[in-house]
């Protein structure tokens, strides 16, 4: 038996049973991949007009700059004949499957630093403590089982910890705790406290849980 969500009626019959959500922290910019901006490329190197920048504050990293030039993509874009979408020459194979994917160009954030922008993308708010997208899906749609987490989290590590991610990105916020994601770790114990402690066999642990 599963755990039902709060949405009792759906507009469409669900087709997907599972979702794999990949978040590439520090990945290529969208204007280098899918977001074709010919006017920006044309004005590359020009100063940002006051009509665009307005009164927006700048980050501490840019405080010492006296010039704020526009920066367009250095890569060429090709328009897909069937979908009309544009793809840069960095992703030629992705362009070949343009009919099978959905590219959303209408999303934006006013965050000027990485961490608030990441939290906004994961939760819909720059303020910490809000439920993440996985928690909302668990809350709304439920889960096909009652004995496993609603969703799990895998973090990749390189030579340096460059991912600007923390538990806010998979936290349940003000929703019940069973809607929170469970982080898997590398090594012998991907989930803490599931392995039997030294000197305790499976039968003994079962008796403790049953008691």
Describe the role of every protein-language-model region.
Residues 1-211:
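Ligand-binding pockets and gating/stacking loops
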